[in-house]
């Protein structure tokens, strides 16, 4: 939908429509938090031009954005503060689904000790496949890629145990290989010889304890897809309004979040 289309539908000029928009953009709406004794949060950040990062705290079960923050990136201190504020305002977080960003993991553990953290399976699958390549040549990479691609088939605890056993056996068989190093004889500097394969394997190994909590509670989202689709639509919408200043872009996003929440009431 373009400005030209909206003007045609409303029967007004582009300048008149822009004036109406500017009135809204000058003052962002107030955000309200819904008390929830069993909140299942999905937390994720996305980036816009001009070093603008939007961090969203989405209550998955009630489909409501409880809180948002504008920043330059996902920061531990800010996310921790946000989680503490949510708790103080009556949002009792039972579980958090996130992509594994260090700032989010650390903030969740410090602000909400004992909270269940579910790692986003879509993120693990996507990142692993990026590092392992679309068509890996190395046999070890092919094997790990095949294991990773089974993630979405896990529906039961037996499936989980079988998958974990498969991955752990692969890791045991290939640990020496993925830890091989190259050393520069002149400088003494070293690096991992199979860097990308190692990155994929270590990421999965570290995430493993928090990959399958959704099997114990079906209200726990196993991915942050709900937020990512949210972000996708937001970016499509804001792309129509090119040329917004940073402050107007923030105001536009706030109005978008506000109206999305209104539809959930």
Annotate each language-model stretch with its function.
Residues 9-102, 106-114, 207:
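RNase H-like nuclease fold core
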Residues 1:
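Short, amphipathic alpha-helical "recognition" segments used to contact nucleic acids or chromatin
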Residues 94-105, 112, 142-265:
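Acidic/histidine-rich catalytic cores and adjacent linkers
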Residues 112-136:
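Inter-helix linker motif
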Residues 4-8:
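Residues within the helices of the helix-turn-helix
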Residues 11-13, 75, 120, 156, ...:
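Helix N-terminus capping/helix-initiation residues
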């Amino acid at each position: 939908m373009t400005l030209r289309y909206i003007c045609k539908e409303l029967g007004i000029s582009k300048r008149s429509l822009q004036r109406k928009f500017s009135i809204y953009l000058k003052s962002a709406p107030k955000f309200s938090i819904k008390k929830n004794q069993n909140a299942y949060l999905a937390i994720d950040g996305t980036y816009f031009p001009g070093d603008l990062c939007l961090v969203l705290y989405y209550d998955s079960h009630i489909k409501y954005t409880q809180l948002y923050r504008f920043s330059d990136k996902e920061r531990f201190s800010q996310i921790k503060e946000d989680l503490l504020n949510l708790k103080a305002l009556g949002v009792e977080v039972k579980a958090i689904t996130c992509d594994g960003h260090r700032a989010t993991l650390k903030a969740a553990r410090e602000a909400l000790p004992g909270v269940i953290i579910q790692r986003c399976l879509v993120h693990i699958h996507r990142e692993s496949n990026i590092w392992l390549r679309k068509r890996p040549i190395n046999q070890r990479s092919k094997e790990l890629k095949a294991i990773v691609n089974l993630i979405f088939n896990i529906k039961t605890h037996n499936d989980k145990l079988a998958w974990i056993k498969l991955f752990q056996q692969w890791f045991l068989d290939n640990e020496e290989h993925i830890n091989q190093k190259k050393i520069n004889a002149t400088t003494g500097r070293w690096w991992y010889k199979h860097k990308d394969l190692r990155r994929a394997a270590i990421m999965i190994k570290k995430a493993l304890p928090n990959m399958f909590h959704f099997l114990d509670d079906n209200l726990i989202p196993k991915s942050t897809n709900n937020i990512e689709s949210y972000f996708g639509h937001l970016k499509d919408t804001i792309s129509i309004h090119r040329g917004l200043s940073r402050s107007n872009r923030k105001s536009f996003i706030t109005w978008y979040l506000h109206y999305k929440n209104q539809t959930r009431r």
